[in-house]
Design a protein with these regions (language model features):
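Glycine-rich loops and low-complexity Gly/Arg-rich segments
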Residues: 67-70, 84, 126
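Surface-exposed loop and turn segments in beta-propeller and other repeat-based domains
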Residues: 72-83
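Short, surface-exposed coil-to-beta transition loops
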Residues: 52-57, 84-87, 112-114
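Terminal domain-start segments
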Residues: 1-33
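Mid-length scaffold segments of soluble, non-membrane domains
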Residues: 33-69
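Structural signature of eukaryotic scaffold interfaces centered on beta-propeller domains
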Residues: 27-36, 84-97
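Acidic, small-residue rich beta-repeat scaffolds with periodic aromatic anchors
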Residues: 1-8, 13, 88-135
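A short acidic, glycine/proline-enriched capping/turn motif at secondary-structure boundaries
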Residues: 49-50, 75-76, 106-108
């Protein structure tokens, strides 16, 4: 992780990308998915809190298995009043693309931000939309 972190979590984030549940989902993505971003990365969505339609995103380098978590806690579909999201957020990517976009409500450091957010990846760090964890 190229941003402030404590092992496998961004500082102040409740998401531990090294716990058994996340490792199992990452291992499954490596086994079953093909690169879908920037020629050799697998952009994988990991389940976080299904009851709130929340997922996280990781990039996995298909050449060596290195995992790069997007610096968010989770993303979901649009928030609908007090009930929250009623669907999953949408991710746009392609094998040759230099950016991917997330149309959603991003949850970062206990705050939501809604819209369409685009990110790039330079091989070490995410670029484009800046989240609180990237500060």
């Amino acid at each position: 992780m190229s941003y402030p972190h404590s092992g496998c979590s961004y500082t102040y984030s409740p998401v531990d990308f090294c716990d058994a549940a996340h490792r199992a989902q990452i291992d499954e993505a490596i086994r079953t998915q093909v690169p879908n971003f920037k020629t050799h990365y697998i952009l994988a969505q990991l389940e976080e809190r299904k009851e709130y339609f929340q997922r996280s995103i990781v990039l996995i380098d298909s050449r060596d298995g290195t995992v790069y978590p997007l610096p968010i806690d989770a993303f979901s579909g649009p928030l609908v009043g007090k009930d929250g999201a009623r669907e999953y957020g949408k991710v746009e990517t392609s094998l040759q693309a230099d950016t991917f976009c997330v149309s959603s409500a991003l949850l970062v450091y206990r705050a939501f931000e809604e819209g369409r957010f685009c990110f790039g990846f330079d091989g070490v760090r995410f670029t484009g939309h800046a989240t609180q964890y990237m500060q």
